[in-house]
């Protein structure tokens, strides 16, 4: 019973993140690494990845290198060097209750902008 409840909470977090990311203009959802990793792109560039096979919700976002270091120092257990990514430009964010929803959205928005969201797709 408790296990089912924890799975439900996990899925709610994933769905909330997914809904937020998909609410951003021109976002494409893909699964290039298999069904256990959702990858979101803007203008063909990845800016948000979330694994579906972890006990805790965690996701990767692009980040300005200087800001990435600051965040890792400020939140050492919630903001880690990007897992399987260029650690200078990517952070792994652990959704463990330390970071607020506002902070999570700011990190997603920053990544979205870094991936080139301000430029429209050429048609």
What are the roles of these predicted feature ranges?
Residues 2-123:
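Charge-dense, helix-prone N-terminal extensions
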């Amino acid at each position: 019973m408790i296990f089912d409840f924890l799975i439900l909470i996990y899925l709610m977090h994933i769905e909330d993140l997914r809904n937020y990311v998909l609410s951003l203009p021109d976002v494409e959802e893909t699964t290039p690494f298999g069904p256990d990793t959702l990858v979101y792109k803007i203008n063909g560039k990845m800016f948000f990845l979330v694994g579906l096979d972890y006990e805790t919700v965690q996701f990767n976002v692009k980040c300005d290198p200087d800001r990435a270091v600051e965040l890792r120092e400020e939140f050492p257990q919630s903001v880690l060097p990007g897992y399987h990514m260029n650690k200078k430009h990517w952070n792994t964010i652990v959704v463990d209750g330390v970071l607020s929803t506002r902070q999570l959205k700011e990190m997603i928005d920053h990544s979205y902008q870094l991936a080139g969201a301000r430029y429209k797709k050429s048609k």
